[in-house]
């Protein structure tokens, strides 16, 4: 515990002794928000606000402070004689001046006015402590020239402590407000078409609907393995079989795979399935939807993303998978078998392994040489059958499927099919996936016999799509990392700091700065008795924080 934290806890106890509850249970009747008061300023109007103290300037019997609420910040003015009308001035002199800190949350009743320099301000008539903060905020520092430094900007700290990020970096909150607006725009777009929003299981007996490595867990009561869903596709198609002709879900999916700026193991996807439609119809719908999202969020179809100008105005370019590969590599792979594909991968220095079948080899070529080329929205259409085990065979080419993926800024944003509804063909495709699994492909699909059974009862012609919402939100908010658009991105847990005494901390901190050194010389730098020193070194050795060894001449000590 730091000195500041100790002081704040002492203030907490002082408040309690004065009969002030630092964590009151009753509601505080907020009637106003900071930005609204500034934008719709009314002289001398009564206001009730609440928020966190972000700065204070105490000048004897008066003080200016800044309060931050959910919408922004506003200046407030504390005057002792306004707050304390009778002879007892303790609420200002003791509670406000001495026992409150930056970071505390308070409620305020007051009136609006403008200072001599014209700044809109709340004159505090009364205040109430709503929460006593026990840790100081890591606020940026300002040097003598007014330059700000040491801001809360370290990426790892921001992601690990998103609550602080939201308090200290106002632009972060704006990203997540926009995230909700994007999701609501999509939901309204689909609801106006009378499509039905549904929920399907997250824990599944078979991880179906995509080629991906699943997370596995165990259900104790049923004594069976269960998987976190990698996709909700098969369940939504079962609903189409059941007669629900248009269904969608904002799905939380989980894939036990790598992490980078475009991937998080837990992510959000929109899945939509509409009966009696095909992939051409779905392309039109997708264009309309994404164009609308862009306009609703930005007021126009063109946005600046990183250093690029991206235009979301429909219609979007369309190019087949094979044509795209030929355009950017010079190879026509449309008639190549697995061995030929493996050879040209080697020729182009594309990393492959023996577990990869034809579909994954083609995907590797496209991913390595093509996808980064598509900046403006582009539909990649007509995928090989080996890459699309859930997709209907192309109506004019039996080696292809009616599938498209939407690429924007070199990222896959959406994946869509004319859905395979032939149960015999579907079972054969699943069996081919099973063979890939035997070869070592840990992303190969499982066979879902209940899904096959549902198809045998009959699923109407259907088109389906999955849109990666996190990536779409990245684009629309000009963020280059998926972690920026997730409240709590996945992070490796920090090793818990061992609990040690304050004296042991002093010894350890000094040793960590020195590194390995002579035990007796290091010991002489502290004013501890031999008994105390033995106790401290034992404490640190038991926690595996230091090691003591002997060479030919000396006893050595070093941090672990």
Language-model regions: role of each:
Residues 1-499:
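Class II aminoacyl-tRNA synthetase catalytic cores and aaRS-like
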Residues 497-526, 535:
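Short amphipathic alpha-helical interface segments
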Residues 528-542:
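Short amphipathic alpha-helical interaction segments
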């Amino acid at each position: 515990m730091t000195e500041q934290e100790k002081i704040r806890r002492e203030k907490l106890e002082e408040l309690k002794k004065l009969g002030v509850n630092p964590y009151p249970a009753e509601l505080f009747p907020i009637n106003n928000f900071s930005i609204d008061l500034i934008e719709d300023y009314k002289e001398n109007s009564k206001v009730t606000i609440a928020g966190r103290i972000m700065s204070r300037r105490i000048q004897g019997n008066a003080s200016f402070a800044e309060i931050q609420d959910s919408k922004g910040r506003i200046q407030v003015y504390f005057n002792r004689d306004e707050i304390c009308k009778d002879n007892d001035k303790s609420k200002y002199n003791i509670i406000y001046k001495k026992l409150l800190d930056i970071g505390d949350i308070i409620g305020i009743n007051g009136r609006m006015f403008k200072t001599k320099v014209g700044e809109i301000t709340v004159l505090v008539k009364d205040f109430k402590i709503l929460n006593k903060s026990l840790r100081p905020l890591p606020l940026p520092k300002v040097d003598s020239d007014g330059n700000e430094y040491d801001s809360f900007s370290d990426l790892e700290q921001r992601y690990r402590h998103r609550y602080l990020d939201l308090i200290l970096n106002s632009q972060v909150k704006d990203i997540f407000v926009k995230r909700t607006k994007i999701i609501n725009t999509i939901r309204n777009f689909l609801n106006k078409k009378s499509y039905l929003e549904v929920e399907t299981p997250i824990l599944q007996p078979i991880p179906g609907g995509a080629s991906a490595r699943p997370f596995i867990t165990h259900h104790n009561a049923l004594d069976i393995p269960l998987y976190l869903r990698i996709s909700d596709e098969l369940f939504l198609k079962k609903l189409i079989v059941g007669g629900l002709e248009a269904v969608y879900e904002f799905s939380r999916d989980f894939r036990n795979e790598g992490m980078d700026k475009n991937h998080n193991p837990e992510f959000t996807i929109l899945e939509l399935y509409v009966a009696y439609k095909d992939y051409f119809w779905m392309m039109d719908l997708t264009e309309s939807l994404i164009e609308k999202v862009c306009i609703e969020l930005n007021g126009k179809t063109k946005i600046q993303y990183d250093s690029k100008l991206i235009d979301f105005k429909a219609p979007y370019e369309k190019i087949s998978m094979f044509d795209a590969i030929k355009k950017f590599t010079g190879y026509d792979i449309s008639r190549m078998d697995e061995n030929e594909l493996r050879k040209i991968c080697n020729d182009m220095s594309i990393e492959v392994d023996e577990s990869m079948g034809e579909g994954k080899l083609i995907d590797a070529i496209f991913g390595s040489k093509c996808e980064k080329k598509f900046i403006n929205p582009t539909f990649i259409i007509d995928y090989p059958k080996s890459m699309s085990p859930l997709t209907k065979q192309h109506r004019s080419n039996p080696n292809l499927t009616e599938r498209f993926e939407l690429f924007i800024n070199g990222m896959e944003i959406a994946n869509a099919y004319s859905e395979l509804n032939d149960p015999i063909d579907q079972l054969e495709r699943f069996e081919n996936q099973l063979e890939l699994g035997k070869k070592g492909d840990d992303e190969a699909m499982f066979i879902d016999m209940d899904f096959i059974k549902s198809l045998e009862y009959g699923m109407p012609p259907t088109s389906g799509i999955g849109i990666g919402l996190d990536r779409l939100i990245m684009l629309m908010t000009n963020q280059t990392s998926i972690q920026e658009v997730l409240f709590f991105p996945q992070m490796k847990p920090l090793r818990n700091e061992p609990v040690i005494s304050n004296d042991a901390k002093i010894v350890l901190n000094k040793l960590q700065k020195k590194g390995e050194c002579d035990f007796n010389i290091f010991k002489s730098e502290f004013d501890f008795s031999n008994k105390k020193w033995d106790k401290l070194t034992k404490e640190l050795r038991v926690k595996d924080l230091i090691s003591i060894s002997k060479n030919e001449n000396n006893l050595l000590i070093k941090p672990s």
